[in-house]
Amino acid sequence: MRRFLLFALTAGISIPIVACSPKQQASREPVVVETLISATESWNGDSFKYPRGQAEMKLEKITAQPGFKTPLHLHPQPGIIYVQRGTLYCETSDGKSLTVAAGESFASSQDTVHYCENNGDEDMVVFVASAGAKGKKTTVTTE
């Protein structure tokens, strides 16, 4: 009986100490998945369609100095753009425009003529993910 009481007393003191351990209070999930964007059409309303041929996924990092402006161009495949640093400004040939700040993402236009520029005062860094076809250009200039 003494052994049982000693065990019960020891367990009764130990359990609250373990339960209040700093490691227990600071625990968190080992991984967190956060969807930054999920889209069925582009920012300007273009419907997505995949090009014919062998699928090719591409991720490009683009660094542009202040004042850089692309020529008029289009993208023949769906894509997603994430602005890591700076501000990206895009405008379509029909006058629709979009300004995207650092930390934001958007679904790029498809088959719509547009230009983009860094109109900020620091280098702009963007990541472009494209779902195209092997051997096909992801950007087609129209000028």
Regions found by a protein language model. Name each.
Residues 64, 94-111:
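Short acidic-glycine-tyrosine-enriched beta hairpin
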Residues 51-55, 67-80:
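A short beta-loop-beta micro-motif enriched in histidine and acidic residues
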Residues 69-71, 89, 106, 110-116:
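Histidine-centered metal-chelating micro-motifs
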Residues 2-10:
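Sec-dependent signal peptide recognition
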Residues 75-94:
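Glycine- and acidic-residue-biased ligand/ion/polar-headgroup-sensing regions
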Residues 111-136:
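Ligand-binding loop in jelly-roll beta-barrel domains
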Residues 4-5, 17-58, 107, 141-143:
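A short, N-terminal "cap"/entry segment at the start of jelly-roll beta-barrel domains
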